[in-house]
Amino acid sequence: LRKLFENEVIDQTTYELALAEKLPGKPFPLPEITPHLTEKLRNDHKGTQLTSTINYSLQQQINEIARKNYEALRQNEIHNLAILILDVNTREVLAYLGNSPTTAEHDHFVDIIQRPRSTGSILKPFLYTAMLDEGSLLPHTLVADVPTSVNGYSPQNFDKEFNGAVPASVALAKSLNVPAVRMLQDYGLQKFYHQLEKLQQKNINKSAGYYGLSLILGGAESSLWGITNAYAGMASTLNHFNSSSSEYKPKEFLEPIYKLNKKADFGKNQFQPEVFHAGAIYHTLKTLEEVNRPSGEENWNFFS
């Protein structure tokens, strides 16, 4: 201030008034409740002030859940995780945790929600739904779980065992690989690829032939953002069907919303679904309720 006054940048009155003011307190660090979403907002909407749809209480809960699980998982050299929670009815992002509270050595700054990763077995329910939808499969239809080789490709189940003939619903609940490959071959690779396009799996962007039958076993990549939205779209299809006298919306698989006061436009009611009929979705979701839990958690439903 003295230099400004001596150099006649400010007059004496301004100088004396400035000296009389109390010094401001030191700035406190900004809360890092959801840093990866903050970075996404900054990149997507530069120079714009906006309010997110994040539920503060829920976000704090998942941050704590992630912290506790990270402490356990890192003992097994698992250093990264992500959590995304959407409201199925509004498609709003309620909680967004892009990575674990790990270190820079393990890339804590990387937003795993947006990064493409191997799909593993997460596409199997889509294939099951598609086959139910066209009538080529029923939940109790027996599918073969036997040694299989297709043009030199020989899928294996996780336990390296074969179960013979199993109901399709059981094959999905147990996430059996061999039946999934055989089902994809029966349904049609190209046809399933087009279904994934309808489900907005934008990271699966090479030709169907490039992926081959391994598409159903993690041979492709998708993001948690895209996968979560696809499952939300299926649930939303069922919800709208049940609440609208058996009608559908034309835009069930629209992008998740993270800006407050932006409303999802699912379109006007129609008689045909955007992708899958409600009945096929219902049976798929019921089957997924029977998914085997890890060893030691078999009786989870008694405590839920």
Regions found by a protein language model. Give the residues of each.
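Second-shell loop/turn segments in exported
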Residues: 1, 5, 24-28, 45-53, ...
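Non-catalytic, structured segments within soluble enzyme domains
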Residues: 1-60, 64, 156, 194-208, ...
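Peptidoglycan glycan-strand catalytic modules in the bacterial/periplasmic cell-wall system
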Residues: 1-9, 101-104, 170-177, 185-188, ...
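Active-site SXXK
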Residues: 4, 62, 91, 112-143, ...
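Short, well-structured active-site flanking segments
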Residues: 11-16, 109, 132-150, 187-193, ...
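Conserved catalytic neighborhood of penicillin-recognizing serine enzymes
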Residues: 27-42, 137-192, 236, 258-290
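A penicillin-recognizing enzyme superfamily signal
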Residues: 52-73, 83-87, 96, 103-113, ...
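Short, small/polar residue-rich loop motifs at catalytic or cofactor-binding pockets
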Residues: 77-80
